[in-house]
Amino acid sequence: MIKYVHTNFIHKKKLNVYNYERSENMKPKYQVIIEDIKSKILSGDYSMGEQIPTESVMQETYGVSRHTVRKAILELSNEGFLRSEKGSGTYVSNQYQSKASGASANKTIGVITTYISDYIFPSIIRGIESRLNKDNYSLLLASTNNDVEQEKKALEMMLSYGVDGLIVEPTKSNLYNPNISYYLSFKEQDVPFTMINAYYEELEVPFFCLDDVQSSYLATNELISKGHTQIGLIAKMDDLQGKYRMKGYIKALGDAKLRFQPEHILSFNTETKLDLYANLKEFLTENQDEMTALVCYNDEVGLEVVNVCRQLGISIPDKLSIIGQDNSYIAKNATINLTTLTHPQEQMGHDAADWIIKKLQGKKDLPNETYYQPVLVEGETIKELTAKRDEVR
């Protein structure tokens, strides 16, 4: 049974979910100060024992009254983030960590994913939860909507709560991430964490990932083996998966001695995803006379291509062959039998949770890198071009 406490919080036995997808209402000024100072402490901008600015400086910085500043300091002191010394000033305290440790005495693992209810994420979370339940761990779950500000809030929540370990799916993993300092704070506090689906290349962190290069390589090679030589790619470029899937596509073309054609690439990111339908329509219209096949970033994109082709009157696979990636439930339940490749999903979640538990148990020699190999799932969206295949041979 799920109990709804308020709009941004869902509580379930052994599962707490925080969702930051809604914009926050206007906050009282003292609350703004509290959140800013907490953020500086949790990210390491203010170190333990460091004196924070004086009340008068804070008045000027935040444009508030002395009363508002004192109210914020009192609240932060009560929560264990600050301590005041008469005649000396106010300093960063570590009492919040001991309070948090008490709060998480029931053994809690934090999980941060980009999304919760979409695509392959329910399966991944199910795998995590099933493994944690075996050792009586609770799960504290947050989503970022692939937005770094929401990731920041999720990390602050995990640090404040004092989770015993953390499993993270990175946000916009192919771009610079401004929240690296929070991950370093977890390291400094000896809180084990691992990443799934991708990782931040700036950090040395254990991870569990599909071999995305191989996935896209196999997808492209499957089309080549069916005689296709004019093959396009739909790529998402703000996530590391997109970078490596493009790499696999380029490698497969090179191995087959086929020319890479930039005009056959359509890229998008989180912000432009809403425009993908319109952009696909233009892209397919411009290339339909030459391009015979498409490697899609994932199944979701593949099915969007199907929708656009229906509107444009492009028959799949007679006029255009397509292949997805991830073997998601939406592909399995689609009206068209999409050719795709596997993703570990639930197994990945289980293995990441198992790694965290073993780390907390003091186990040594745990893997730093785990790659899962994709397998082709044959569908009905690829046409064999026999004559062209013979020409390639």
Which role fits each region the language model picked out?
Residues 2-103:
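N-terminal helix-turn-helix DNA-binding module of bacterial transcription factors
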Residues 204-233, 243, 251, 273-282, ...:
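Hydrophobic alpha-helical segments within soluble ligand-binding/sensing domains
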Residues 133-143, 233, 252-274:
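Short beta-strand elements in bilobed, periplasmic/extracellular small-molecule ligand-binding domains
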Residues 36, 281-393:
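Flexible loop/turn connectors
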Residues 120-134, 215-218, 240-259, 304, ...:
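Short, solvent-exposed amphipathic alpha-helices that sit
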Residues 217-258, 263, 368-382:
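An alpha-beta-alpha
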Residues 111, 163-172, 194, 232-234, ...:
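Periplasmic-binding protein-like
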Residues 2-25, 35-39, 93-218, 285:
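Alpha-helical recognition/docking segments in bacterial nutrient-uptake
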